[in-house]
């Protein structure tokens, strides 16, 4: 239980900030932790800051989380080649998101305590999304920075969920809990994501509806 492990660790932490960090990541730039702290420590700074994570093949694994992608949540610019600026420079700009991954997440200890830490009912999946949404709903900012970079050997810590029926059932239950806690409509309408873009992929391409309007396959009926 990832949530339980981190909640347990909080009992023994005494700093002003907590860093959630998976044991399957490797640091890419020396000042990564300074950069995360920079985004949180200045006046008006974020309560949470996440990092830019890469796969070992030099494609992006995480550049912020968009809720609603794939029906629940997905990673911005996932699988994009490293080095580009992304959609509207969003892969190269410090910005706010609704959530960031818990694989590398810095949070103010006071905010962690205020919202009660991680929800242990989300044992593995979506605990980071749920946590960030509760922090956002409490009035705080969640930031992501491309200037803290790490390589993430995703799921090496625990393995995949797809082929194990027990893990698959747990994952499905956590998906439904995300809707139950935060509301399906809320999950599907991320305020940091253009509703004209696709919810099926993580590449910021146009939605089928917008493409249909541009190609004339879909028409809009105006009412007086």
Label each PLM-derived region with a short phrase.
Residues 57-58, 69-96, 106, 142, ...:
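C-terminal, non-catalytic tails of nucleotide-sugar-dependent glycosyltransferases
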Residues 18:
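Short aromatic/hydrophobic "clamp" motif used to bind/position activated sugar donors
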Residues 32-37, 90-116, 121-151:
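A short, conserved alpha-helix in the catalytic core of glycosyltransferases
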Residues 1-13:
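Glycine-rich, basic loop-to-helix element that forms the pyrophosphate-binding segment
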Residues 21-23, 119:
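Active-site acidic Asp-centered loop
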Residues 49-52, 145-146, 153:
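Short glycine/serine/threonine-enriched helix-capping/active-site loop
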């Amino acid at each position: 239980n990832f949530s339980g492990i981190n909640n347990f660790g909080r009992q023994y932490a005494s700093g002003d900030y907590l860093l959630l960090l998976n044991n399957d990541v490797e640091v890419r730039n020396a000042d990564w932790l300074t950069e995360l702290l920079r985004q949180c420590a200045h006046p008006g700074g974020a309560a949470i800051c996440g990092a830019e994570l890469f796969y070992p093949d030099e494609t992006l694994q995480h550049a912020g989380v968009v809720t609603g992608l794939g029906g629940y949540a997905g990673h911005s610019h996932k699988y994009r080649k490293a080095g580009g600026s992304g959609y509207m420079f969003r892969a190269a700009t410090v910005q706010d998101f609704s959530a960031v991954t818990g694989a590398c997440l810095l949070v103010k200890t006071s905010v962690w305590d205020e919202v009660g830490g991680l929800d242990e009912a989300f044992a593995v999946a979506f605990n980071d999304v749920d946590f960030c949404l509760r922090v956002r709903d409490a009035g705080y900012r969640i930031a992501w920075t491309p200037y803290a970079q790490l390589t993430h050997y995703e799921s090496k810590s625990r393995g995949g969920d797809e082929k194990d029926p027990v893990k698959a059932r747990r994952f499905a239950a956590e998906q439904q809990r995300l809707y139950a806690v935060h509301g399906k409509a809320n999950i599907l309408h991320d305020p940091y994501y253009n509703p004209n873009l696709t919810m099926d992929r993580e590449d910021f391409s146009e939605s089928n509806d917008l493409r249909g309007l541009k190609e004339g396959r879909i028409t809009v009926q105006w009412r007086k």
